[in-house]
Amino acid sequence: MKHTRPVDRPLRRLRRAASVTAVAAALLAGLAPAAGAAGPEASAARAPSPGRHLDRAALQAGLDAVRDAGVYGVFSAARDGRERFDGASGTADLTTGRPVRADLRHRVGSVTKTFTAVAVLQQNAKGRVDLDRPVGDYVPDLLPGERGRKVTVRMLLNHTSGIEDYIADAFPSLRQGSTTSLDDHRFRTIRPTELIGYGVARPQRFEPGTDWSYSNTNYILLGEILRKVTGQDPERLIAKDVIRRAGLRDTYFPGTDPHIRGAHARMYESFYGLIDPPRDYSIYNMTWGGTAGALVSTPQDLNTFYRALLTGDLLPQRQLDQMRTAYDVKDETGAVVLRYGLGIFSLDTPCGPAWGHDGGVWGAGTIALSSPDGTRQFALGHNLTKYQRLNEAGTAFDPHPADAAMRDYRDQALCGRTAPQAPAKDSIEGPAALSPVLPALTAR
């Protein structure tokens, strides 16, 4: 099968952009929420459609549209009550031509954060973690001094701590607009305390609790709080109390093993044209993601997880309510583009709000969303990332048809229909410095 490569743009445009290293450090980490304005159609239709169901032909056509837009391979699972759809389109391995399957294992990036947040809230229910207690009370050596007294556990969970992300320091070539660190550190093992040290060494982005800024450092700190209060390795704790409790069979932390166990796709990273042709990063030591983004899972497992979470199987009602108490994330015009709770976010769709998370690591992108009552979910993985290109000014991303195709698929999977699309803008606004925001799926 012939694959359409996303439109190439001069690489000098990316390198000359004043904020390129910030964009690189934020976006390509991919352990990031896909924040974006919900668009007019979302506010016009808040209630679920009566009699909606899974239209398998429309869903498969939606996956084919993502492939036709230039993404090498895309695979997904959708559920509505007892109805299920499993579909895939495209290629898992460009060298062999092996096709993707719906049940492939995949690195799911920041979807890990919901799992970590559930584990923290379980400890809150047991009285071991107070969400409004200072982080310094739990791990004083990791967040010392005044910051340790001001930043609370809740602020870590909802990204209002103001603590800087560690990605740009963990992959230092990004600050020079180069991707060489991605290859240099493919087999590196890095300790959680090192990652935290990178983020904490940077100046605060704002006074704790006064603003919002996505930071993977927050969730590595949460892992260390879990270690402190339980005496257990946090990844093993999450495996026992969250993954096994939810009945997930294909979800695990890989630890230092750079290989994914079981069937999976190759994972191709473009990095906005800096890596041309896109390079396979499916073999990678994911200790740099840890409790912020190292999980391997499948679309089917993610649907099962979010259904179990939102129907109350993993948390008491009080903790679930806390989890869905969200901070309104606004753009420069003051419009709410995302509502971020405790390790889970809400965005608008044509049939009302959906809850979940997304993520991406080198070459692997994921989105998993559910209706608020947990009756309908979808999860999608794709194996080409950062295919977008900056505009001529180097300040924003040009619209890419794959993003629109993924939004259409999202709406079909969750709502049984797609929303009318507003005329495309000349470009998609780029993210603020070191504030990860993926343009796919929700940007309009």
Roles of regions detected by a PLM:
Residues M1-A42:
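Secretory targeting and sorting signals
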Residues K2-H3, G36-G87, R279-R444:
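Catalytic loop of the DD-peptidase/beta-lactamase superfamily, centered on the K-T-G motif
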Residues A57, A117-V118, R133, I220, ...:
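A generic alpha-helix surface/boundary motif
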Residues L63, R82, K113-T116, V120, ...:
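Residue-level preference for non-acidic, small/hydrophobic
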Residues A69, T95-M155, F206-S215, G290:
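Short active-site loop at a secondary-structure junction
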Residues G81, A92-L94, S161-G162:
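Solvent-exposed coil/turn segments that connect beta secondary-structure elements
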Residues F85-G87, T95-R98, D165-I167, Q388-R389:
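Short, solvent-exposed loop/turn elements at domain surfaces
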Residues E146-A354:
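Short, surface-exposed loop or secondary-structure junction motifs
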